Amino acid sequence: MESTITIENVVASTRLAEDFDLEKMMESGLEGAEYNKVKFPGLVYRINNPKAAFLIFTSGKVVCTGSKSIGNAHAAIINLANTLKSICCEKIDLEPDVRVQNIVASADLKTNLNLNTIAIAFGLENVEYEPEVFPGLIYRVEAPKVVVLVFSSGKLVITGGKCPEDCEEGLRIVKTEFDNLGLLY
């Protein structure tokens, strides 16, 4: 019943400049960019290699989402920095400090789970289970600080990690606790 995580999304942020003129950026030919400051204060820009989406703000800050690895998120941000430098922004940090804000991963225990039994066995301390509201059980792991969504199909979503190891450890903790309680069948 070995299970490992699959990274589904990495959210990373950085500061590429002191500030950005988003109107100028739109006029400079950033293909596919979307900016409507009435709807959202940032410019939205997507790339395909590596696949990522960016939220670019006037403060010079950038949020990158949609990458499947930390390396791809970092590469995407460097690509963005080079693109912006070449089309409109001279004062760009080409070696920015990239910080991972969140990793979302999935895993499959490859067995069906009785969520009512799990909720009763774990009590109310770190678990929320309201099937009328949400079909999964929400299990909060304290260290590392991750949240594991557990579904009756045995599929899990692990979120809140700052590195893949946080998600792996969250999975290991949940599997160990389920196994110790005899809940994996």
Curated annotation (Swiss-Prot):
Annotated GO biological processes are: DNA-templated transcription initiation
Fetch the InterPro entries from UniProt. Answer: TBP, TBP_CS, TBP_dom_sf
Keyword annotations: DNA-binding, Repeat, Transcription, Transcription regulation
Q: Which domain of life is it from?
A: Archaea
What residue spans do the sequence repeats cover?
7-84, 100-178
* Chain coiled-coil ranges: none
A GO molecular-function term, please? DNA binding
Pfam families named among the record's database cross-references: TBP
The entry sums up its family as follows: Belongs to the TBP family.
Q: Which HAMAP family would you find in this protein's record?
A: TATA_bind_prot_arch
What role does this protein play?
General factor that plays a role in the activation of archaeal genes transcribed by RNA polymerase. Binds specifically to the TATA box promoter element which lies close to the position of transcription initiation.
Name it: TATA-box-binding protein 3
Tell me the gene name: tbp3
